Amino acid sequence: MDTILALTGITKRFPGVVALRGIDLRVARGEIHALLGENGAGKSTLMKILCGIYPPDEGTIAIDGEPRRFANHHDAIAAGVGIVFQEFSLIPDLNAVDNLFLGREWRGRLGLRDRARMRRAAADIFARLGMAVDLSAPVRELSVAQQQFVEIGKALSLDARVLILDEPTATLTPAEAARLFGVMRELKRQGVAMIFISHHLDEIFEVCDRITVLRDGQYVGTTQRARTDVGALVEMMVGRRIEHSFPPKPPLARDAAAVLEVDALQVRENGPVNRFALREGEILGFAGLVGSGRTSSALALIGAKPARVRRMRLRGRAVRLSGPADALAAGIGLLPESRKTQGLITEFSIRHNVAINNLGKHRRLRWFVDAAAEARATRELMKRLGVKAPTPDTRVDTLSGGNQQKVVIARWLNHHTRILIFDEPTRGIDIGAKAEIYQLMRELTARGYSIVLISSELPEIVGMCDRVAVFRQGRIEAVLDGDAIDANTVMTYATSDARGANHEHA
């Protein structure tokens, strides 16, 4: 094997915790190497060490057999290590050329920027990627996929020989992801080594050559893609074999009482008027393509988005929800798609995040919060939901994605909310944490909670939902239940004009 990158015995300690313990990693020239592990396994810490952001406490880094010590990120770049983070670092109002050469502009003899030369170099880079990018347009006008290719181009313009791709498909459509994989294969052909981090095992099997798994900051093993399967990888990641990600569905209760009846919901002027109902103890899926109206309908439902028409009944009584505060008072809670920016105050503790929707619950002498009672209640919810953290006063930004999602759920349970809207609840969460979230959702419905599940992942919709409302162009095309819930049927209604006869099903 023509090894270009060798990490040996990498150990990293932070106060009170050993984040990495003796990690070994070998990556060959022209190889796409997957790095797998649950959130908190140490992937990000290892990549930050490779990029010069953290120094290792023990261990060595070698590039082309030459030992390297990176004092900072610039040292790693100079050694040929590039990274494309999940969150882009582009300047929105600058074009692709200016973003590529920001801070290291090429200059002519008079010290002026040589724009023509930089533009030619940028065109060569994108030709190398096989991508057409408008070099004159501000990058904010480019698609998400094109912005990602600009990030990759930045790394290549710095002569990156080892390229780290951190969850690169998280915001891409399937077509854009396929285009990215084509670019990765072309870079592989050119001899660039890539470390590919993804929670999507189907992507790993599609594009990677070898796979290294970390668990709890330790090296578990490296395997050839062709010599393993999904079950074996999951067992390596979580330390146990997960036979079924989705818990069994209970029998469909067609006579269950409706807790929420939406008699008319029209999000935009001249748009379709939808009707649906949510039953006690069920998971109702909102399925459809991006832009189909799933999320906008849910936001309009709770008053977080304006609606032209909104008529609904809560447990048989007419209710007006003019905003999220009204929804909160009515016992309806939203777990938003972006938990870090919309669902949590990440700089706050678990206790403060759990209590924020119900500050009066543990008040004493009218004005003072009983911090001890608040901590006890938070500790009970942490135990009930399986939140892995030392204390209720642990900061939320130190938790994994799965544990952060559980904190959002705990906040609503602390308020005794009985109707929960989950918007993309497992996005960015590893496979073990997904199984825990799914089990938790079923435990909630068994206690009489009702859930609306909005998801772009068809297996999640099919595996978790008792009924599914399929949206297309803002309209509910059909409400499916029982054996009718399968991927083909959902996609047929989501993409075709064949409207279901029961699209006003209640």
Curated annotation (Swiss-Prot):
SMART domains per the UniProt record, alphabetical: AAA
Bilayer disposition of the protein: Peripheral membrane protein
EC category: translocase
Keywords carried by this UniProt record: ATP-binding, Cell inner membrane, Cell membrane, Membrane, Nucleotide-binding, Repeat, Sugar transport, Translocase, Transport
Keyword Cell inner membrane: yes
InterPro entries for this protein: AAA+_ATPase, ABC_carbohydrate_import_ATPase, ABC_transporter-like_ATP-bd, ABC_transporter-like_CS, P-loop_NTPase
Matches recorded under SUPFAM superfamilies: P-loop containing nucleoside triphosphate hydrolases
Swiss-Prot/TrEMBL catalytic activity: D-ribose(out) + ATP + H2O = D-ribose(in) + ADP + phosphate + H(+)
Protein name: Ribose import ATP-binding protein RbsA 1
